């Protein structure tokens, strides 16, 4: 079966495909104004004929960028009367208590675009006041004159009974059939009014833009006589149908980055690495995620933007920490003479100064070029020649001259600050979670990841770095290994020890039925599907929960001794203590439904024996490393010419078509039998 994975990032569009049993790759600049053009060009460069493809897997930053850039649809919000300000007020706590410049999340829809409706349910879903359909109809008729493109509907307690939302949705869609309508129960059947409202608004806000983009992508593929399926990468680490993505685009917020972490998990399993940190550095951002036993952690919530003032999203998402430091991150000097890198990025257009597209702002890639770390003749496998003079001039004018430094000193400062910022992301997923980084391995990928990984690993004492095959397009490869996945949740509150067993059984059965319906809708066979149930538990009086896997409702009833023990162990692991005498409370029941891919050739290829594909070639050049006072003469090797068992001791640079690997003095790199590079770091006593 011929399949391709296409990852559209802020700077580059990457493709990995399996065509007639062979793996092909390509990397091209993203076209911000028309992302589909990048998809078309990546297919052309990889010699992939859409007519011969059975499946396209796709990840994109379009949803999250729409939020970060605040370029979403004009959105209206319908709420229960008396609850108009839930979304605007948010939570009363200050996440950053001592930040004098703290500000709350800015709502994506204005207060005057929030409409109250007469209706009311109690917490059990029983009707207190019927929905006033005439009010909904009157509101619907006023929306076009206000330029509304999308509507979010979030009624109180609709997670327990969606009937009122369903009626409101029917009215809205009948009167304004072209308006994108999101009903909260279709996205999230879970309590927490503010987070549920925020998630619903997010889906509506990005919906029209994502729907139009995916429609354009489908049109292009059909025009090219593509007759296969399109699946989208979702934030929980699985894939979904393109139809589901158009209905639930909020699930695509981290669709590109999580694919790389899925691939890193598969590689860790192949290399028998129990605990590793996936590190992905692209052109716009750098990402890190903790991976245990081949699986990245999944959290039941996420904040888009900064933790303090971003937009809450209460959906499962792979636990990724992201910082605005990538190859295209712009370096700048503030009014006090302080040097900064990012978060603003030069993107694909105009890109770094060395691209020769007219930019005069120095970025991390320009600094790496000045330091001799990048070969200007071999960038993108020779497809783009880099302008060293333009890079040096940008660093000189914007950084070196204002700070009274040499060009090389300024470039080293840019690279050092970028590495320090990225090391914070790695710390956040290791040290901050009680994991000793000295007991982990870093798996580095992304176009710029292998160039900076060793120095970042050294800063926090990670002893080993692994650079996989095709690191520059590794996220696209990860898509080919992702399973179909859908998460379902129901709020179900009760004290462990006195639960209604029949009610718990009924909720689990409803979740299973909903899962089977979604499998059928997406054309996925139930045979081989994995139904995993979880209970969200907490000590009574706590605010947040921990998910504990359950086999059936029987684990929740009686004294539930097994469940209690599992929770205490997990609580101790997460927080360093367990209150063994405290009562437990269940809050939600969950179903995680997955179906593994039938085609495993991408995983098999990652474990295939490596053979050199090009004749041996070696050169040397001067490179400036971190903390180095002067350039160091370094070996330069071409990765496609290396053989399994080859050992290289730094200083060295290993180049390959879509990435560059920097080996610091004294560090030792070995090529595994399957072609992956293992770098063992040396540390001063």
Sequence positions of predicted segments:
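Short beta-strand-loop/turn "lid" adjacent to the catalytic site in phosphate-handling enzymes
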Residues: 19-25, 50-93, 152, 156-165, ...
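Glycine-rich phosphate-binding loop of actin/hexokinase-like ATP-binding domains
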Residues: 15, 26-31, 76-82, 102-104, ...
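C-terminal, non-catalytic interaction/recognition modules in large multi-subunit enzymes and RNPs
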Residues: 134-142, 273, 283, 291, ...
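Glycine-rich beta-strand-to-loop/alpha-helix junction loops that act as flexible
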Residues: 60, 155-156, 184-186, 235-236, ...
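Conserved phosphate-binding loops in N-terminal lobes of ATP-dependent enzymes
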Residues: 5, 14, 25, 54-57, ...
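N-terminal glycine/serine-rich phosphate-binding loop of ATP-dependent small-molecule kinases
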Residues: 1-76, 122, 129-152, 165-170, ...
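Conserved phosphate-binding/catalytic loops in two-lobed NTP-binding clefts
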Residues: 175-199, 461-477
């Amino acid at each position: 079966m011929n399949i391709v994975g296409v990852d559209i990032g802020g700077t580059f569009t990457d493709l990995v495909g399996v065509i007639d049993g062979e793996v092909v790759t390509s990397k091209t600049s993203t076209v911000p104004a028309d992302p589909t053009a990048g998809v078309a060009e990546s297919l052309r460069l990889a010699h992939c004929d859409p007519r011969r493809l059975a499946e396209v897997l796709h990840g994109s930053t379009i949803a999250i960028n729409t939020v970060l850039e605040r370029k979403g649809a004009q959105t209206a919000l319908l709420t229960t009367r008396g609850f108009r300000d839930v979304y605007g007020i948010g939570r009363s706590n200050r996440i950053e208590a001592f930040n004098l410049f703290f500000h709350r999340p800015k709502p994506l829809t204005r207060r005057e675009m929030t409409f109250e409706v007469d209706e009311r349910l109690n917490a059990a879903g029983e009707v207190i006041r019927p929905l006033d359909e005439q009010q909904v109809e009157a509101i619907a008729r006023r929306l076009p004159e206000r330029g509304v493109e999308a509507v979010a509907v979030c009624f109180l307690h609709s997670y327990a009974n969606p009937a009122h939302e369903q009626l409101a949705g029917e009215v809205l869609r009948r009167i304004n059939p072209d308006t994108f309508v999101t009903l909260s129960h279709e996205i999230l059947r879970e309590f927490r009014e503010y987070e549920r409202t925020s998630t619903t608004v997010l889906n509506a806000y990005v919906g029209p833009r994502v729907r139009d983009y995916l429609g354009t992508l489908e049109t292009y593929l059909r025009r090219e006589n593509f007759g296969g399926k399109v699946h989208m990468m979702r934030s929980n680490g699985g894939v979904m149908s393109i139809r589901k993505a158009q209905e639930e685009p909020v699930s695509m917020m981290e669709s590109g980055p999580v694919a790389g972490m899925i691939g890193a998990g598969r590689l860790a399993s192949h290399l028998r690495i129990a605990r590793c940190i996936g590190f992905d550095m692209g052109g716009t951002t750098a990402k890190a995620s903790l991976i245990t036993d081949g699986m990245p952690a999944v959290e039941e919530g996420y904040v888009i933007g900064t933790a303090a003032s971003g937009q809450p999203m209460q959906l499962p998402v792979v636990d990724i920490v992201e910082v605005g430091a990538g190859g295209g991150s712009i370096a700048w000097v503030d009014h006090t003479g302080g040097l900064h890198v990012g978060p603003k990025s030069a993107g694909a257009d105009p890109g770094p100064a060395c691209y020769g597209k007219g930019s005069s702002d120095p970025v991390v890639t320009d600094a790496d070029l000045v330091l001799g770390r990048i070969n200007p003749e071999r960038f993108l496998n020779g497809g783009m020649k880099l302008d060293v003079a333009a890079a040096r001039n940008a660093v000189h004018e914007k950084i070196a001259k204002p700070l009274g430094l040499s060009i090389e000193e300024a470039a080293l400062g840019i690279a050092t600050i970028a590495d320090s910022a990225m090391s914070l992301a790695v710390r956040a997923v290791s040290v901050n979670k009680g994991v000793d980084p000295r007991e982990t391995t870093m798996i580095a990928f992304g176009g710029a990841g292998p160039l900076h990984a060793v120095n970042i690993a050294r800063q926090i004492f990670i002893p080993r770095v692994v650079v996989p095959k095709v690191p520059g397009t590794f996220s696209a490869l990860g898509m080919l290994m992702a399973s179909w996945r859908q998460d379902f949740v129901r709020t179900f509150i009760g004290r462990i020890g006195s639960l209604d067993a029949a009610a718990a059984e009924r909720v689990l059965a409803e979740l299973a039925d909903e899962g089977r319906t979604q499998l059928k809708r997406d054309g996925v066979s139930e045979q081989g599907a994995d139904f995993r149930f979880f209970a969200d538990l907490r000590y009574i009086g706590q605010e947040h929960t921990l998910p504990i896997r359950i086999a059936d409702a029987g684990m929740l009833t009686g004294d539930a001794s097994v469940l209690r023990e599992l929770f205490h162990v997990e609580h101790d692991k997460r927080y360093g203590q367990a209150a063994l005498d405290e009562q437990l409370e269940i809050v939600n029941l969950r179903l995680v439904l997955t179906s593994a891919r039938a085609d495993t050739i991408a995983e098999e290829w990652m474990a295939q024996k490596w053979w050199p594909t090009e004749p041996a070639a070696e050169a040397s050049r001067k490179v400036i490393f971190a903390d180095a006072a002067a350039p160091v003469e370094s070996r330069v090797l071409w990765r496609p010419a290396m053989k399994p068992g080859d050992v290289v001791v730094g200083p060295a640079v290993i180049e390959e078509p879509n990435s560059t690997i920097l080996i610091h003095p004294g560090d030792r790199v070995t090529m595994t039998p399957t072609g992956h590079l293992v770098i063992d770091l040396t540390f001063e006593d």
